């Protein structure tokens, strides 16, 4: 199976959600090596922890926006443009690791799952903007 992940945090964050994202990738690669795992990130960033993982597991790769258009609009790519790239690259399951999925993924044949880390926004909505 080809499994894609929102890899923004895995690539760009060195603590918190970045650690969580790398941990999920590490565990899945270790216990389910028959699958291919692709972490999709809007931008490249030097990250030694991520480099160790991709060096350790041949089935784990990084992917970035495929066209110059989406490279320039990388934030929009994460919420809209990524879906067509996932389809072209044969992703069967997409995991949003940090509370969100692409807005149009439901229109594709790709199954999806999202991890919600915190529900405090439900208890105290006045402290959060609607975009969040």
Go through the PLM ranges and name each one.
Residues 1-132:
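Carbohydrate transferase catalytic cores enriched for Leloir-type hexosyltransferases
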């Amino acid at each position: 199976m080809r499994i894609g992940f929102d890899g923004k945090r895995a690539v760009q964050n060195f603590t918190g959600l970045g650690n969580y994202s790398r941990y999920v990738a590490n565990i899945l690669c270790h216990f389910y090596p028959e699958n291919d795992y692709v972490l999709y990130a809007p931008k490249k960033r030097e990250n030694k922890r991520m480099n160790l993982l991709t060096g350790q597991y041949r089935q784990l790769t990084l992917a970035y926006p495929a066209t110059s258009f989406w490279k320039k609009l990388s934030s929009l790519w994460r919420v809209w443009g990524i879906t067509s790239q996932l389809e072209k690259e044969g992703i069967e399951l997409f995991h949003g690791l940090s509370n969100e999925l692409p807005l149009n993924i439901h229109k594709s044949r790709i199954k999806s799952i999202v991890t919600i880390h915190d529900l405090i926004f439900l208890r105290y909505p006045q402290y959060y903007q609607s975009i969040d």
